[in-house]
Amino acid sequence: MRFLVLTGLSGAGKTTARGFLEDLGYFMVDNLPPRLWLPLLQEAAARGLARVGVVVDARALAFFQDLEEVLEALRPTVVYLEARPEVLLRRYNLTRRVHPLGAGNLMREIAEERRALAGLRGRAHLVVDTSELSPRGLKEALARFLGEEGGFLLRLVSFGFKWGPPQEADLVLDVRPLPNPHYDPALRPRTGLDPEVRRYVFSEAAEPYYRALLAVAGLAAEGARAEGRAFYTVAVGCTGGRHRSVAVAERLAEELSGRFAVEVVHRDVEREG
């Protein structure tokens, strides 16, 4: 699982960055106390979420006495956004927003916030000065740092129809017509990650059907990228989500990884029943 902390100066672009991270599939939470970060990650893992982010701003630091300890224990990726004081001042004047530490003197509030966040800045894996960056430039900087090819991510989610398709799916592929290892006693306890299960699923007779699925997934992802989408989710479903869907999602990832940045999530592989 990827865990990211997004922080930095107010007016430096955290709202833009948060939206872009959500487009990349991150589940984002604002100012969650650090003592709740581990339970959040545990719940996210149980729900098949592969990317989680927490936004931290200066207002919350007074309530985050355990922040250093939790950062040391969980070691998230920390992204810090900043800008020159005169740029932040200009942005506030344009939007007529009140600074979160609002006390009537904007330059003093900016300096106070910078001091308050100095510890987090020192821990940052990426510091971005957005003074001369457009929103698009900020997104591109984040995409490069996070290893997202062109800012576009193809997500492949295996699932079982008996548990319901993923709500976030843009495209659902039905692989139930493929050979089912469930009916082979030797293969039933295994998963689609097992080489023997994969050989069973991808028999010679199954190959035309798989190639058609590959073509559809590739065309759909290409179209989404051309439209400027940040990510596209292809859900791959079999009956229980343990054998065929897992095997197909893995093979799709292997064959499409040369064209897209790909992430694979096996939502139901450990479910029983």
UniProtKB/Swiss-Prot annotation:
InterPro entries listed in its UniProt record: P-loop_NTPase, RapZ-like, RapZ-like_N, RapZ_C
Signal peptide: none
Entry keyword rRNA processing: no
Residues that, per the record, bind ATP: 8-15
Alphabetical UniProt keywords: ATP-binding, GTP-binding, Nucleotide-binding
One protein family per Pfam: RapZ-like_N
GO terms, molecular function: ATP binding; GTP binding
SUPFAM superfamilies (UniProt xref): P-loop containing nucleoside triphosphate hydrolases
NCBIfam families named among the record's database cross-references: PRK05416.1 (NF003828)
Family the entry assigns: Belongs to the RapZ-like family.
Purpose: Displays ATPase and GTPase activities.
Name assigned to this protein: Nucleotide-binding protein TTHA0319
Organism: Thermus thermophilus (strain ATCC 27634 / DSM 579 / HB8)
